[in-house]
């Protein structure tokens, strides 16, 4: 994570609804998407929502600067577009968003960000 710790998904997911996001902070859509996530995090964190954001950015310094003020868990895969983790989730393009239920089951691959809040509420 941005503090130099190895933060595993399992350490934040236990008993929580988790939004997993594969992203690239250098992309032009990233700030708007993070604002949307911020709104959702503010509204639903107390109800059990966690966000686990995986950056595939090449530039570690840019990533640290972009992620340092975000309240959720932000990690970076140094393999970037060759990420084995992204391959496990069949990520072909960014952003890629998934929702895990409180038992850690993958319940949704989000195709429409406009429906993200409804998708989260249905799992909370």
Task: Write out the residue ranges for each language-model feature.
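A short beta-strand-turn-helix
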Residues: 1-18
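Flexible loop/turn segments at secondary-structure boundaries
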Residues: 6-7, 28-29, 59-62, 82-84, ...
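Active-site acidic short loop of glycosyltransferases
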Residues: 14-15, 46, 91-94
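Conserved redox-active cysteine motifs that mediate thiol-disulfide chemistry
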Residues: 17-39
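Hydrophobic beta-strand anchors of alpha/beta hydrolase catalytic cores
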Residues: 19-20, 51, 97
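Structural microenvironment flanking redox-active thiols in thiol-disulfide oxidoreductases
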Residues: 31-68, 80-86
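Short acidic-hydrophobic, aromatic-tinged amphipathic segments that line or gate anion-handling sites
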Residues: 73-78, 110
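Thiol/disulfide oxidoreductase modules built on the thioredoxin-like
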Residues: 81-123
